[in-house]
Design a protein with these regions (language model features):
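Hydrophobic beta-strand anchors of alpha/beta hydrolase catalytic cores
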Residues: 1, 40, 111, 147-148
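N-terminal active-site segment of His-dependent metallophosphoesterases
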Residues: 1-56
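Active-site glycine-centered loops adjacent to acidic/histidine catalytic or metal-binding residues
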Residues: 6, 44-45, 77-78, 114, ...
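Short acidic, glycine-rich surface-loop motifs adjacent to enzyme active sites
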Residues: 42, 141-159
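Extended active-site neighborhood of metal-dependent phosphoesterases/phosphodiesterases
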Residues: 53-146, 164-167, 171-186, 199-237
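Histidine-centered catalytic micro-motifs
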Residues: 148-155, 187-197
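Acidic, His/Gly-rich catalytic cores of divalent-metal-dependent hydrolytic chemistry
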Residues: 231-250
Length: 250
């Protein structure tokens, strides 16, 4: 399957235009259609301004260019929901996308997507109900070979006990989720938010942060992550836009 993150329509030209994001995404989607993955996950910040209907409409229009046979799952980022993650922003997001978390199984692996902005913003009621849902999904997936998590925010960037900052989930919440990851043997989390590639781990739980598809802030060029899931392992590689392979050998 393929993960891409932070297309953030409108960021490149400070909300004046999204023509560059459209051009990049159309190239990426042509490559995705050629690869024909089992599914695609977009880990948040679909647009730069979650209140800009033109940005949202263009993102959705471009995503419809992905072949209908390829399921596409999206998750909210802080730009989609606002930093405060208000009731209004959550409601508007649900109206646009229909869901803010997901779970499904493919070939005996369980894939789970979280609304991480509600955790970051400490929206207690919403976060608590999602946490209860998450634990039930994890508990019911113990016969699967893998449990793989997706979210916009990574739980942490470098160290599991690192200080709270804009890039991670606050410590008081983070420990709860890391304990769940250990208890239910979650192997991987794929996240975004940082606009650069990074990897870290906690016990047997691996966090992979994927660069922005449109607005990189680090040394890596724009690109996508291709993930291959085997019965005994999960393997992934990042490819910049000009180096995406024409096929993937399992």
């Amino acid at each position: 399957f393929i993960q891409l993150s932070d297309p953030q329509f409108g960021m490149l030209e400070k909300n004046k235009s999204f023509s560059q994001e459209t051009m990049i995404m159309e190239k990426v989607i042509a490559a995705i259609n050629n690869l024909n993955p089992a599914f695609v996950v977009i880990t948040g910040d679909m647009v730069n301004d979650g209140k800009d209907q033109k940005q949202i409409d263009e993102f959705k229009r471009v995503c419809k260019l992905i072949k209908k046979s390829i399921p596409v799952y999206v998750l909210p980022g802080n730009h989609d929901l606002s930093q405060q993650c208000t009731d209004e922003s959550i409601s508007n997001y649900m109206d646009e996308y229909g869901y803010d978390c997901f779970s499904f199984q493919v070939n005996n692996s369980c894939f789970i997507g979280l609304n991480t902005p509600v955790i970051f913003a400490n929206r207690e009621e919403k976060e608590k109900s999602q946490l209860i849902w998450l634990e039930k999904i994890l508990e019911n997936s113990q016969k699967c070979n893998h449990r793989i998590l997706f979210g916009h925010y990574p739980f942490f960037v470098k160290e599991s006990n690192e200080a709270n900052r804009y890039e991670n989930i606050p410590l008081e919440k983070r420990k709860t989720y890391l304990d769940l990851m250990s208890k239910y043997r979650v192997s991987n989390m794929f996240a975004g938010h940082l606009h650069y590639n990074a990897m870290s781990s906690y016990e047997d739980f691996n966090i992979t942060i994927t660069n922005s598809i449109c607005t990189p802030l680090g040394k890596d060029r724009i690109g996508i992550r291709i993930i291959k899931v085997y019965p005994d392992k999960v393997v992934h590689d990042y490819y910049d836009l000009e180096q995406i392979p024409s096929d993937v050998v399992l």
